Amino acid sequence: MTHFDTIQKGAQQMGAALSDETIQTLVKYLAMLEKWNKAYNLTAIRDVEQMISLHLLDSLATLPYITGDNIIDVGTGPGLPGMVLAICYPEKRFTLLDSNGKKTRFLTQVKMELGIHNATVANERVEKHSHQGEYDHVISRAFASLQDMINWTLPLPKETGNFLAMKGVYPSEEIAALPKEVGLVSVEPLNVPNVQAERHMVVMTRKG
């Protein structure tokens, strides 16, 4: 099975209807990630089939949660899930923020080579990011805890915006320790094809 077929099948299993053009762009992104990873160590995952499942399909599992038009991915790494989402939603705006220069250089190259015009790459620490109160969604796979995520990103969403945290097993202790400034909306399992480990999406909003 080709990488195109694997991505297409996985997306279909999750109910994501992606055009052939979108899947082709994801295949090109995957090829760039594999190539750059050999030199710059962008991800610990080396096997391409695992990259598809653990990175691409895992990122595609978040598609139903992206209902707003202006999104920031904090600690995006090599663009997960932010670059994947930007490829799938060309009509929405994405800011891909990471303090690691190797990773943001890779993203800048992806943006240029693949023509991803709706993504802005920000090489900075989240506390230095000046666009506060502008985002419909603040999404991240990167934070060690929900508390850390909220502490670092609290000023970023609009009043009507939300926080989307991708987690592994149900994070009951982290939920119990959530800062008082946010309210828990939902915790939903993410069913990612070819991924046995538990995955959850935690949705939170800012109070007041």
From Swiss-Prot:
Upper lineage: Bacteria, Pseudomonadati, Pseudomonadota, Gammaproteobacteria, Oceanospirillales
Binding site for S-adenosyl-L-methionine: 75, 80, 126-127, 141
Protein's organism: Marinomonas sp. (strain MWYL1)
Main location (coarse class): cytoplasm
Name this protein carries in UniProt: Ribosomal RNA small subunit methyltransferase G
GO cellular component: cytosol
Molecular functions per Gene Ontology: rRNA (guanine-N7-)-methyltransferase activity
InterPro entries: rRNA_ssu_MeTfrase_G, SAM-dependent_MTases_sf
Pfam families in the cross-refs: GidB (PF02527)
Top-level EC class: transferase
Compartments in which it is found: Cytoplasm
Disulfide bonds: none
Top-level taxon in the UniProt lineage: Bacteria
Main function: Specifically methylates the N7 position of guanine in position 527 of 16S rRNA.
Gene: rsmG
Catalytic activity as recorded in UniProt: guanosine(527) in 16S rRNA + S-adenosyl-L-methionine = N(7)-methylguanosine(527) in 16S rRNA + S-adenosyl-L-homocysteine
EC numbers on record: 2.1.1.170
CDD domains the record matches: AdoMet_MTases
SUPFAM superfamilies noted in UniProt: S-adenosyl-L-methionine-dependent methyltransferases
Keyword annotations from UniProtKB, A to Z: Cytoplasm, Methyltransferase, rRNA processing, S-adenosyl-L-methionine, Transferase
Protein family: Belongs to the methyltransferase superfamily. RNA methyltransferase RsmG family.
